[in-house]
Amino acid sequence: MSENRLKIGITQGDPNGIGWEVILKTFADPRMTELCTPVIYGSLKAAEFYQKTIADLEPVPFHIASSIHEIRRGKINLILCGDETKIEPGTASPEAGRAAAEALHAAVRDLRDEQLDALVTAPIDKESIQSDDFRYTGHTEFLAAELGGEPLMMMCSDLLRMGLVTIHIPVTEISHDLTRQKIVTRLEQLRSSLKADFGIVEPRIAVLALNPHAGDGGLLGSEEEHIIRPAVNEAYEKGILAFGPVSYTHLTLP
């Protein structure tokens, strides 16, 4: 196995949420360190609490580090953040929100300094994390503000790769936020990601409609004809194999 394993930052998320359970169950398999060098940002107190309370869990040996410069290859590294937080599973609190934000800020600093190759974020509680240092509706917006660039949120399964045009806004605002240029930009981003990250030589992208039955020719909404279809046509002219709008009720998987 190459010594040049990717360094993957992992934030604990809300210490009262599911993040630590997912992290511990993932790294209970010792083979994980053969694939990457994990760097977890979080509370040792929380890690030890969940190690004791989760049934049938193999012990996870952590290498404790105070900074990214103390991590070791082949080890499950834990950079200490928010260790004074009171652990109350399932309970939202400002204290837990601060611990989640502290881990996230520390990881993003190291990512920005090119000390990490990628970042995985455990879930946060979007209400309790709000503070003067964190005024965002989610990880996506925070990372965009800290690292620059236009974010693309994707949802992935074994069969499906789905990019979102709008993110983290009320349903009542979607039609106002939807523009032809935004759709074209998202299609360009999605095509680039599918090629670079998923190895798809030339992806074909179905663009889903906003309204039921793709608007039924304007009877159920005009966004398909006035915004979505022109955007799809423009993207196709740019060499993107996009088609639609397709009614989401017609979306089928192999």
Where are these regions (language model features)?
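A generic structural signal for well-ordered coil/turn residues at beta-strand boundaries
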Residues: 72, 150, 159-161, 201
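Short, acidic/small-residue loops that bind anionic groups at enzyme active sites
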Residues: 131-157
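Contiguous, glycine/small-aliphatic-enriched amphipathic segments in soluble metabolic enzymes
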Residues: 1-138, 181-251
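Active-site glycine-rich loop that binds ribose-phosphate moieties when present
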Residues: 142-145, 149, 171-193
